[in-house]
Structures are given as C-alpha cells and as structure tokens.
Amino acid sequence: MNLERWTQAAREALAQAQVLAQRMKHQAIDLPHLWAVLLKDEGGLAWRLLEKAGADPKALKELQERELSRLPKVEGAEVGQYLTSRLSGALNRAEALMEELKDRYVAVDTLVLALAEATPGLPGLEALKGALKELRGGRTVQTEHAESTYNALEQYGIDLTRLAAEGKLDPVIGRDEEIRRVIQILLRRTKNNPVLIGEPGVGKTAIVEGLAQRIVKGDVPEGLKGKRIVSLQMGSLLAGAKYRGEFEERLKAVIQEVVQSQGEVILFIDELHTVVGAGKAEGAVDAGNMLKPALARGELRLIGATTLDEYREIEKDPALERRFQPVYVDEPTVEETISILRGLKEKYEVHHGVRISDSAIIAAATLSHRYITERRLPDKAIDLIDEAAARLRMALESAPEEIDALERKKLQLEIEREALKKEKDPDSQERLKAIEAEIAKLTEEIAKLRAEWEREREILRKLREAQHRLDEVRREIELAERQYDLNRAAELRYGELPKLEAEVEALSEKLRGARFVRLEVTEEDIAEIVSRWTGIPVSKLLEGEREKLLRLEEELHKRVVGQDEAIRAVADAIRRARAGLKDPNRPIGSFLFLGPTGVGKTELAKTLAATLFDTEEAMIRIDMTEYMEKHAVSRLIGAPPGYVGYEEGGQLTEAVRRRPYSVILFDEIEKAHPDVFNILLQILDDGRLTDSHGRTVDFRNTVIILTSNLGSPLILEGLQKGWPYERIRDEVFKVLQQHFRPEFLNRLDEIVVFRPLTKEQIRQIVEIQLSYLRARLAEKRISLELTEAAKDFLAERGYDPVFGARPLRRVIQRELETPLAQKILAGEVKEGDRVQVDVGPAGLVFAVPARVEA
C-alpha cells in the first residue's frame, strides 16, 4: 500500500479513522472506523456516491456506528496502531481499482467502491462504478485534489433557473430594456459576456434573476431557450482550498463543465471584481487570467455584476475588460420603484403574514428617496417595507399593551397582598380584602381580554395558512402552464384559486375591526421606520407636537429673553419645514445672528436644539476661530487623499452624516478664513456637500445658524442715539457688505440683528440663572429663596449694556455662589436647609431660619 499514490482527502480519511480508533480505545483500525469517517458529512462525496447507486447512506452509517460500539476496548501504547486484515485487503483492492479506472491516485470514491465490496448488503460493483462515472463527469483522477472538482458546478454554483422554476425568486418588475440588452449580448458569437454595472442596491442581481425567470417561462429568443444560469459562488471556490493549485483546479473544473455543456450553461458571477486577484499567490494564476481564454473564444458565456467603483478593478486589466460588454443599470425613478414594490408586495405579505397598503408602498418610495440619501432605490424602499412589516408582525406576536398593563398592575397588587398577609391590625386586614377583590376583578378582566386576543390570533393564524396555500397554488398554476398540463392549470385557476382568495378576503374582513390585531402596514409605520433610521421626524404631526410648534416662541422665550425678531424668524422656518412647505433642496433655515456679545445669539441656537430634539447634544457647534488659516478649512470636509487624517473624514461632514437632523452653529463667523464661505455657499444653496471621500452629505434637514459680532459698536451707538430698529439694521447691513461677499449674504434666509439687553431683561435673566442654581442645590436637598431686593441688587450689579448678560453670571458667582459654597463647607448650611437671601449694607445677607426635618 503506497500512500504517496493517494489523494490528499483519502489520506486524511485514513488518518481520521486512526484518530477515531485511538479515541475509542480499539486495538486495530477496521472497516467501520473508515466508514464512520467517510459518512460523517451528509453532503460529502461518499454520501452522494452511495445515494446515486441506490443505497441508503444513513442506514449504513447507523449500522457501522453500532458495530463500532460492539468492538472491544483495550489499554496501552498499541491502541489504534494496526489495520485489520479485512481493511488492509479493502485498501489493496482500492489500489487495484485505481489501475482499473486508469486513475493516477486513489480517491475517496475509489475507497468507497473497495469498502462497499467488503461490506455485505450494499449495491454491486457495476452499479457503484456507474454512479462514480456520473459523479466524475467522465473524468479520471489525475491530481491530489481531484475530489473537489467532481460535479464542480453543483458544488460551487447555485442554479438560478431551477430556483426560478420552483418559484423561489422574487418577481422582477420592469427593467425590460436592461434584460433585452443582456439577451442581445448573450446571443453574440464572441465576447458574449455582459457585465451589469451600477450603484449598490439598484437591482443588478435582480436583472439576472429576471432573465432566469424569462428562460423558465420560455419568453426568450430560440438561442436561450432551455439554457441554465448558474451563479458561481467565489467564496465556496476559495473556501477550504488549503494547498497550492487546489483553487485553480476547482475553477478549471467549473470552466471545463461549462465548456462541455456547449452553451447550455451561462455562468453568473456576482461581485465580478472578486475574480481579479482571486486565488493569487506567488507564481499562481488568478481567476481572471484563467477565464480569459474561454471568454475570448466564446466557449464560456458569463454574466457579471459589479458596482461602478469596483469595476475599476477590472479596468486595471484591459485584456480582461475588453472581453466584457458593459450594461449600465441606472437607479429607478420613484414611479418605477412604486411599480417594483407593488410587484413584490405579495411575497412580503405572505412572509410576514400582514397586509401592505398601497399608501405604505408610495410612502416607502417617496420618503426613502427624500430622506435616505446615501443608499439607492429600490433597495432602500424594499428595506423600509420589510422592516415595517417585521415590526408589525412582532407586535402581533407579543401580548397587547392593554393586557400587559393590567398584568403588571395585578402583579403589583399580588406583591402588596403577600406583604399585608403578615400584618394583623384591622386597617391592614381591611386593605387586604380590598386588594383581593381588586385582584379577582383584574383576573376576570384579563381572562376576558386574553380570550378575545386568542380568538383574533386564531383568525390571524388561519389567514396566514390560507395566504401560504394561495401562494403555493399560484406556483402550481405557473408550473402546470409551463408543462402544458392545461387540465390541472384550469382546475387550480378556476376551482382552488377563487376559493382560497375568497377565504383570505373573508378572514381579512373578520380582522378589520379587531381590537388587538392590526393587520395592515400603513404609511405611518413607514414614516416611523424612516425616523428611527435617520432621526428626522417625518411621521404625521401628533396633537402634542402641533401644540408645541404653534407655541414654539413661548418655549424659546423660556430661556432667551427679548430678541423677538430672531425668535420669530427661527420659529417660522421650523413650522414651514414640519408642515412640509419648505424648499426640499435647501436647509430648513439659514440665519445670520448679529449683535453685541452676551445678548443670547449662541443661547438661542442651544435652546432651539433642546426644544426640537430634547437635548442640546443635537447642536453641532463649529467654532470659526479654529478655521482662521487657509489650511484649516480642509478639516471641515476632510483632508485630501495622501494627507494625514484622510481616513477620519471632515469634522462638519461626519457630524452631519451621523445626525442629519440637527442645528449647526457656526460661531464667530467673521473670524473664519474667506475660503470657508465657499463651502457654505454650496450648503446654503443646494443643501449638500461632498466630503473628501466623494460622499454626498445631506444638509437639507439641518438648521444653519451663523453668529457674528460685526457691527456691534454701531448697534450700541444707534441705541444711545435713539435710532429705530430698521435704521440700525440698515447700518449694520452696510458693514456686512464690506466684510462678506454678496453671493453669501444673498443665500441666507434671514439676517437678524439682536438688540442689547435692557435692565428689565437682565432682571428676567436673574430668574433664569437662579433656576439653574436651585436645580444644582436641589441635589443636596437645599432650597434657596431670594427677596425681590436681592434680585434687584444682582440685576443692578450685573447690568452692562456693552457686555450683555455675561457680567451677570460673574456677579451671581461672586456675590451668591461663592459665599454659599463657603457656608456649606463650614457646616453653616446643611442638607435639608432652607436658605433665605436678602440685601444688607455690605451686600447679600444669608439666613437659615429653621431646619427642615428630613
């Protein structure tokens, strides 16, 4: 027995048989050990060969395992070191069979033949030899890795035409032009290899599936009738190819099978760019170069699919590229997407067991097109439908909120009941009786609701079964029509089909007024999913939100004192956007806030973010003092290729990509380098910006606020001289025109001049600042009260028309917070105290009148 003349897989099988014998403590390696190893993999070569010969590999495997368990166990160093005479004879017979079959190596299938001869109850040698020839496709074993080349197409490919015949592919709607062009190229004499090129998600693979469906229906020219489209899995070809040359051998076997089929098989390689360089090692030939000769001669028909970016990999190899004919696949329009979704609707309805309304389909196409800008139609719209249906299905399969709330309440009462059982006083006994009565009432109510819910679920289960049967009947009708079994087709179409359709309709009708089961995916569900994905509120305005938007000025005034013009301008822009009236290609609003320091420009931006998004974190703050040099401008959109930091992306673009719905504050805009304004022009006009990676970032759902101190001296001077607001605004505008280019100023929605704060407004700000301090003290359970005189004292000290409200913060820190902190540290003010603050001759006076008991 010469193991050098065995294939790698056969040698490994013998080695594993030895390991098995050692593990089971058997003295010698016998036939059952080798059978157990060969039959371990259900899809393996031995399994397939025995099935083809008409044997039952499963029964054989169980028989050999029983035999193994009966073998005696031994101890010592000699365990599993010898072959039994019957196994040795079978292995020598395998070598004789190798010579008979004109092979160069003993392969796994040859081993199976030899073992089968030595095992009673298996098919004869001739039957096994016939199965072996069929499995090998008439080839002999000439290499050490020959097993991986048997039935290569079946092993490494997926037959799309078979899947289409079984109705397992989704219907392909439209795309007739592209399918016609692919057919046209396939019918050429040479270079008949179309490659579908398009953005990810536009439906390149679907076009090939559409062609497979047409071939099955016979809706193709004579030259393509009866052909098979096999999708080659590059991953399967590469997987497990441990030894050099094994990958090339597998691919060569695939190419040979396709060539031998004489045009019956059309190969399809998704992600075609993976062919370039696949299996490349030092001195090895990559897949692309192995395909070239067959492609050029027209012996092999290949359809490829790849994206625009990845097609560049193929363009690097002109000899490979010239063998392909590109077919460009454009993104479908919203209208075409709606047609595609209507065609797919039934598949998703059957899968999820829900109904998808037409309004949901239209919403999925329009909302995904408008708000999910980084992905392509129809893929993103299909994803929306799928997720919304999955969400509804999940809701249907879990307990309704109404029942859930009652059960939680019941559990709470049961816990309370157990605690009260230990108490003996009359009050507790009284309460216990009341609780038990309430628990009994709740139990009855829950049982009633559960019964109703179960009844509705039962109807739903029947509906899903009917939908599945309906789907199967439609598939059977298609199959019968293809096979010209017209009697069967008519029987199903005019007998079974209307009956099932009526059943589905009747069950759906029963659920229409259901209390717990909502069966239909609506546009509201789609809007909800879009909001989850993007953070952009696109769902219909709820009553509470309408109120909030109508009272937006009031909300903003809670934190920003005065500045009515600015607040009104911002609130109007937000209302226009949420009512759906804003220009869809521009940001929600773009404002330039001007005014002296400390009057609330930045505070308004923060307040707007907190009001709209319930958190100040939703504000993207770009401090323009960091962008004063020319080279710093690239940080906004990312460093160019080749520079350090290219991978990180831009500070502005990355922030907006992660939060497409936000307030962007460009603080101190006049300090920025002039080149920054060139970037801003694009954002303000088109609502988009391309970063250094070539990705388009969408700014259409952002509020852009720029703040500046330009013209502050003029504002103060105008107020001292008593100029009207309009004149101050015009004077400031003249200063702006000297500093900013007209095309920049012209793109802003509103230029708002903030007024300096008056004494009365500073007094209001005292209240706001004190509320923040009280909130901090509340954590220490200390309450703070200030007399009106104390508040006036702080406002008086903190008023400065030039510096706005900022001096007030310093006054509060100095006069109120610092003395209070000293008193807390000295133990004069403790947890639970009430501190009263008044004015004395030397400033503020603190008093702790009475301790509040904890």
UniProtKB/Swiss-Prot annotation:
Q: Does the keyword Transferase apply?
A: no
Q: Which residues form a coiled coil?
A: 382-513
- Record region (NBD1): 151-331
Q: Region (Repeat 1): which ranges?
A: 6-71
Q: Which Pfam families match?
A: AAA, AAA_2, AAA_lid_9, Clp_N, ClpB_D2-small
Region feature Repeat 2, mapped onto this chain: 83-147
What is the documented function of this protein?
Part of a stress-induced multi-chaperone system, it is involved in the recovery of the cell from heat-induced damage, in cooperation with DnaK, DnaJ and GrpE. Acts before DnaK, in the processing of protein aggregates. Protein binding stimulates the ATPase activity; ATP hydrolysis unfolds the denatured protein aggregates, which probably helps expose new hydrophobic binding sites on the surface of ClpB-bound aggregates, contributing to the solubilization and refolding of denatured protein aggregates by DnaK.
This protein is called what?
A: Chaperone protein ClpB
